[in-house]
Amino acid sequence: MPGESIIPELYMPVTPEIVTSMTDNPGDAVETMVERLEDDHYDISDADRDLLLDLDRQIRLLGPSEFSDHRHEFLLRRGLIIAKRVGGLAAGVDDRDAAEDIVQWINTEQTGSPETNKDYRVAFRTIAKIVTDGEGYPDAVEWIPGGYPDNYDPAPDPTDMLGWEEDIQPMLDACLNSRDRALVALAWDLGPRPGELYELTPGNIVDHDYGLQVTLNGKTGRRSPVLVPSVPYVRRWLDDHPGGDTDPLWCKLSTPESISNNRVRDALKDVADRAGVEKTVTPTYFRKSSASYLASQGVSQAHLEEHHGWTRGSDIASRYIAVFDDANEREIARAHGLDVEADEPDAVGPIVCPRCEQKTPREKDACVWCGQVLSQTAAEKVEEQRQTARNDMVGADEKLANALATVENQLGDDVSLRIEGLDE
């Protein structure tokens, strides 16, 4: 399995002062970097400093319709890292030799994944295009490849994916509070980008006919996917949340003060450790796992793109469909004369309590809201516990046992009043 890291590998080669600001809101992170550039805080050349400040000005002039806060921060940060680690950023915009030095560093010394290195190459080319005011890329950078190495296999590995039954449910059982349960369930159900996950507020979540609807403002625009299996856990945290609609969703348990992005990642890792889940549990892997589950259940590429905020015809979405949708294999088997039937989707969504009509986790024996037992097995278990307790009571104190029997006769068959300890 891939190694675990609290800080995503995209930021691994950077110096501590850069890592510190990367966990903030992207708009705030941009302001911090600009202030430090203006104060000559960074150990970079004057030419590179001036170019980065010009980059910031040009992005602000083009406005949010062209560059979101995330994209603004993405370009400015990578430009700053190149200026610090290699230098010659300003020269590389106009000079092929200087540009080659930067690309060589990206390809050989910038110790990231193929995706990370691609991001740096694309960012470098885009920076050059923005600051030269041209219609296209300057000659010095136009040649820079924006793709992946020939031997790069971007297909998701099924063994890395987090499954609801084998991974998510044990993590939910290992959580110590309603916030962490909501975090685990929502991250898998919604599959948001890390930045989208961190920036959620209670006001982003509203009721929907099929569950809860979440409004996200991602890099491809606004979308509003629907939560299903995570609904009971998210509702419980919304009830327990100490703040209002505009406060951070992921806050401290007793105050609406935001917890850091690092703390959100730590919470996932801590829960996984307690549950014995050894797979990578970063927000990115929750996103990948969400996509893999939807693809495996026959969700179309168009719907997967809409749910995860990918552009139409996305190569990423098509990879998940190719790896996890077994429709092609079924058709080939059918062509060879086998009697093949499509598997029924795995049931992971919540069930509706017949008493209070709230959604409760499918795996629970009793409604988490009103205590109503939800299966014959659960009812029998409650009755068995009651009989055992009554027998013990008779042996210890016959008068108290008779009093208890009187109370039970008044309660009748309403075992929900006794269900509190059933799952303990």
Which sequence ranges carry the predicted segments?
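Basic/aromatic DNA-contact patch characteristic of tyrosine site-specific recombinases
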Residues: 1-77, 136, 391, 395, ...
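Basic, alpha-helical nucleic-acid-contacting "clamp/cap" segments
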Residues: 2-13, 17, 21-28, 123-127, ...
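Short, basic (Lys/Arg/His-rich) helix/loop patches that form interaction surfaces
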Residues: 245, 265-306, 310, 314, ...
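C-terminal secondary-structure termini that scaffold catalytic or DNA-interacting sites
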Residues: 17-22, 334-424
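Catalytic-site neighborhood detector that most strongly recognizes the C-terminal catalytic loop/helix
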Residues: 219-220, 308-343, 374-377
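Basic, Lys/Arg- and aromatic-enriched nucleic-acid-binding interface segment
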Residues: 161-194
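N-terminal core-binding DNA-recognition domain of tyrosine recombinases/integrases
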Residues: 1, 31-43, 52-157
